[in-house]
Amino acid sequence: MMETSDLRLTRIPIKHGTGQMPALGFGTLIPDAALTIAATKDALEAGFRHFDCAERYRNEREVGTALQAVLAAGGVTREEVFITTKLWNSNHRPERVGAAFEASLERLQLSYLDLYLIHTPFAFQPGENQDPRDENGNVIYDRGVTLLETWRAMENLVDRGTSGTSDRDKSNRGKCRAIGLSDITLEALKPLYESARIKPAVVQVESHPYLPETELLEYCKANGIVFLAFAPLCHGMKPGLLEDPVIVAIAARVGKTPAQVLLAWAVQRGTALLTTPRSAARARENFDISVLPEDALDEINRIQTRQRLNQVVKTGVPGFIPKGG
């Protein structure tokens, strides 16, 4: 991690790739097109320089519109901004990876991506339908491709000048600076890491004090992988972390909001994070974090509640696990 006394400026070096990831990231999972554009601009204005996108979110074009408007206005350069997007489950077949990457680049109006992630380890029936279902409403998985085969195609995006792939794949080379995985367990990550020619640069998973993922975090640190936490505020679900007595008490003591306390904790433990403020005021709040004292970090680490909110690690299908699940 790049040492700085200002947590807002923390950048984490990409060891299995190039560049540095700003620890404070803006997640673009916003269903409304107009709100996506406005919120992305607000986040840039607040100071966010890390943006996490996905084919699945169906709003890459709007994110690109907002980003290009801000870049054109000056004050922010493309080199300052770290952009991630993700390969969706229905494009896991190796022959589909290059086209999916190229389509995301076009929608985002970019000449390169800082990071391209496999959105989940689960392959769905290949095709344009992002959510293929059978007559009983069950997801149709693709049993004809392995995660490692998809990873090899991801590696090809990073490579330069290797023969034996399609012209489309060759044209993408140099446009993908790093690759990684999202919604993966430690058990699934280990064998892929061992087999990978180009190691995963980043692993993105749900993580917060109710789901610290300590073992996965330590594995990532030991192997030069950036740990990127989504849902660091538990999606704002109530009752939840924002109302947790420990977090509320620390916030009052240090003069910050509960959200700011949770985001500072995430950065200070060595992770990057994603948050999705949908207003300018919330973007400014979420960006305005500062160092927590050691006793506050210890109190948060001692929280015993354990809860996973998102079931995607089990099925590849986005959604929330009901309480008690």
What are these regions (language model features)?
Residues 31-44, 93-108, 185-189, 212:
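Short, acidic/polar
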Residues 18, 97-118, 157, 170:
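CE4/NodB-like, metal-dependent polysaccharide N-deacetylase domain
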Residues 1-81, 98, 156-163, 233-234, ...:
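N-terminal binding-site loop/beta-alpha segment at the start of enzyme catalytic domains
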Residues 24-34, 86-94, 139-143:
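Active-site mouth loops of central-metabolism enzymes
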Residues 77-91, 115-121, 204-207:
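A short, structured active-site edge motif that brings together acidic residues
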Residues 49-57, 84, 177-180, 202-205:
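Short catalytic-loop micro-motif centered on adjacent basic/acidic residues
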Residues 13-16, 64-78, 105-109, 193-196, ...:
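Acidic (Asp/Glu)-rich catalytic clusters
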Residues 120-325:
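Beta/alpha (TIM)-barrel catalytic core signal, keyed to glycine-rich beta->alpha loops juxtaposed to Asp/Glu
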